[in-house]
Regions:
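Conserved N-terminal beta-strand and adjoining loop/helix that marks the start
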Residues: 1-15
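Conserved hydrophobic "DFG−1" position in protein kinase catalytic cores
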Residues: 9-10, 17, 80, 111
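Short strand-connecting beta-turns/loops that link adjacent beta-strands
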Residues: 12, 22-24, 71
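Short, surface-exposed beta-strand-loop junctions and turns on beta-sheet-rich folds
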Residues: 23-25, 126-127
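A short gly/proline-enriched turn/hairpin at secondary-structure junctions
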Residues: 29-30
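Unchanged
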Residues: 35-58, 68-123, 145-146
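Local beta-strand/beta-hairpin segments that build beta-sheet-rich folds
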Residues: 63-64
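Charged phosphate-binding loop/patch that engages nucleotide di/tri-phosphates or the phosphate backbone
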Residues: 120-146
């Protein structure tokens, strides 16, 4: 059973998302990815966020667990704080940068205004709806299954 860890990162009323063009299918998703066999979800979260954005997580709280049929069975969604930084950028050593270079898939980080988030073609609508509620009313104190 595969797992993924993803980050909700909000700064200055903007949410950090990854815009993907994967084999012609365009959508938005949260930063993050696969949990390796030798790590837990929090370790994967820290690693994936660093690889994909260059940002260092200083705090993370699990807020959602989502069943996701392909390619992961479960996604663990964390509300994250990050260390002070310059702008987020895909790191040259990441899988996303490699795929961008060989022009197989395109991955692009974007800071999206909270109010514009609902208009994005997000990968999973039920998670998008949960995030919208969290952005507007506050995220749950304990993890909720979506």
């Amino acid at each position: 059973m595969g797992k993924a860890a993803r980050a909700i990162i909000v700064e200055n009323d903007k949410l950090l998302v990854m815009h993907r063009n994967k084999q012609g299918s365009q959508y938005y998703t949260l930063v993050g990815g696969r949990v390796s066999d030798n790590e837990n979800t929090e370790q994967a979260l820290v690693r994936e966020v660093k690889e994909e954005t260059g940002l260092d997580i200083t705090e993370a709280r699990l807020v959602y667990v989502e069943f996701h049929p392909e390619p992961y069975n479960e996604q663990y969604i964390y509300l994250c704080e990050v260390a002070p930084h310059a702008d987020a950028a895909i790191q040259d050593t990441s899988e996303e940068a490699f795929l961008n270079r060989i022009n197989v898939n395109v991955h692009q980080l974007q800071w999206v205004e909270k109010k514009a988030f609902s208009k994005l073609a997000f990968r999973t609508p039920q998670l998008q709806e949960a995030i919208i509620i969290g952005l507007n009313k506050g995220f749950p104190k304990e993890a909720v299954r979506v």
